[in-house]
Amino acid sequence: NPDKQLEDEITKIHIENKDYGYRRVYRELRNRKIFVNKKKVQRIMQKLCFQVTSFTRKSRRYNSYKGNVGKIAPNRINRRFNTSVPHQKITTDTTEFKYYEIDNKGRMVIKKLYLDPFLDMFNGEVLSYGISKTPSAASVLSAQKQAIEITSDCPYRRTFHSDRGWAYQMGAYSSVLKENKIFQSMSRKGNCYDNSVMENFFGILKQEMYYGTTYYSFEELKDAIERYIKYYNEKRIKEKLGWMSPVEYRLNTLAA
């Protein structure tokens, strides 16, 4: 088989990146200095039965809005998500996941897990995150602290964006931003498009590691999310980033 070497390489890429369609596999091959026709890649993937199974599910979005319980910041980002400067514009939000556990009476019960990531709008990289069993101020503040430390090398004044969730209205949250001379920005009430960068990340995350899979403990789901975030940051290539992963793109930009 003259294509055996190519088939082996495509198989390797597929094992590492199960969500890649033929266009991404073609780009990953080019990144590995293997130059072949795009149609050939598509043909081999069909032959090897490497189809991408996308599970999409309309689920009710987790809503952390509890009314005006603290200070509302202006929408400084105002959908200007693009920036050529790493660590300048950061966005955050909370999303929930479900998992199953057997209680002491032997019944299967639904439990929830909450993820609080801080994401760099420059390259879509997840800079820090908190994972908890209940909506947690401590989880948000811990991830916020890490994000502030990581982005402290930014030469310009930073902006941290969020929706109007109760955690981002807390004095503890906004005062830390103030102390570090960071602008606080908030979406308009009930307008998810004002934070579409984070909505998009949540959609990709859930499609690629959550929908279609059942998790049977908090630890199992937490571990899957942590492994996915590492993969998303370091390996998952994006067309928008010149077919590089978020970390690769940042390092390339800094080296230029």
Regions found by a protein language model. Name each.
Residues R79-L127, K133:
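An active-site-proximal beta-strand-loop segment
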Residues K178-I182, I204-A256:
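C-terminal domain-tail junction helix/linker
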